[in-house]
């Protein structure tokens, strides 16, 4: 009898939680982007916004907490209320590399990810009139002219920079990476002929298709928007990389709520209209849910840390 009473009490305690999670969301969800408006983190959140409303009946309210390349926002994530109504965008390699460079107010393990939903693949980009018609052309030039092949990119320790370090090692070349503050300035340097090429993203190819060409994209398979552009893997280089984006919640968020949010983002990702919108912008969909998040981060940490040490980004 005593056991039955205890079981009844336990069941009663579980039911309200389960019921609340089943009804979630019952009000707007606050989606914090740890960067300013207009960047890809903002653009992809805006893409999610309308689908969230249509599927779940509540608004996804986007706000911004820029600073420190995302660090200001991530350092405050766990101070937010963990009720499922506060979520924050996360980026790789940022959340892995930044804490290794200096004190930024958070460690990678402080981030509780519930879904990695896409990445913008790295790509080597050249102007339409570039003498480099293929990736091999660029590699041959770099081998004959060590450190004289200049390539712009978005900052040190970014996805672009780590891709440059990794590819140089794979190809047996030494190029010179010229870091700019943001993709926009790196593209401007390319278009202004200040560099020979750019370590950019597939989104650059989508946005500036009338002015640039991509020699290769860092994907497992060719991007559907760019069927004529080969992957690095096709050309003999095992390089799949880019700027990965996902969503995290405060650590205090209950496991049931994390799982529910994870399923919601998965549902948006599966929508053909959402996929088409993302791919048209040059992005690639990814489906790493809450259950697979830690394993994914561990795998990427090893890749990024090796490249960061190789490139002198961290000691």
Regions found by a protein language model. Give the residues of each.
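N-terminal (or domain-start) structured segment
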Residues: 23-110, 148, 156, 169-199, ...
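Bacterial N-terminal signal peptides that target proteins for export
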Residues: 1-8
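Sec/Tat signal peptide C-region and signal peptidase I cleavage site
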Residues: 17-22
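C-terminal lobe and pocket-closing loops
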Residues: 119, 203-270, 299-302
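Bacterial N-terminal signal peptides
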Residues: 8-16
């Amino acid at each position: 009898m005593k056991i039955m009473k205890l079981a009844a009490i336990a069941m009663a305690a579980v039911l309200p939680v389960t019921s609340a999670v089943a009804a979630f969301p019952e009000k707007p969800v606050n989606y914090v982007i740890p960067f300013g408006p207009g960047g890809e983190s903002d653009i992809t959140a805006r893409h999610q916004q309308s689908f969230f409303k249509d599927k779940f009946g509540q608004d996804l309210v986007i706000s911004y907490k820029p600073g420190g390349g995302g660090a200001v926002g991530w350092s405050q994530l766990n101070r937010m209320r963990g009720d499922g109504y506060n979520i924050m965008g996360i980026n790789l390699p940022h959340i892995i590399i930044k804490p290794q460079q200096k004190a930024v107010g958070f460690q990678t393990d402080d981030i509780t990810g519930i879904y990695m939903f896409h990445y913008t693949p790295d790509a080597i980009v050249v102007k339409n009139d570039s003498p480099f018609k293929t990736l091999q052309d660029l590699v041959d030039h770099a081998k004959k002219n060590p450190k004289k092949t200049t390539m712009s990119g978005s900052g040190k320790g970014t996805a672009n920079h780590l891709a440059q370090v990794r590819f140089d090692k794979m190809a047996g070349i030494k190029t010179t990476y010229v870091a700019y503050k943001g993709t926009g300035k790196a593209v401007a340097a390319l278009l202004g002929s200040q560099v020979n090429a750019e370590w950019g993203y597939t989104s650059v190819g989508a946005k500036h298709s009338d002015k640039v060409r991509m020699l290769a994209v860092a994907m497992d398979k060719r991007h559907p928007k760019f069927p004529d552009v080969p992957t690095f893997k096709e050309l003999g280089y095992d390089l799949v990389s880019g700027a990965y984006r996902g969503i995290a919640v405060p650590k205090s968020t209950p496991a049931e709520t994390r799982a529910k949010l994870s399923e919601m983002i998965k549902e948006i990702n599966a929508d053909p209209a959402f996929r088409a919108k993302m791919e048209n912008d040059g992005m690639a969909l990814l489906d790493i849910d809450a259950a697979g998040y830690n394993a994914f981060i561990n795998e990427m940490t090893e890749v990024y840390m090796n490249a960061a040490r190789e490139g002198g980004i961290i000691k």
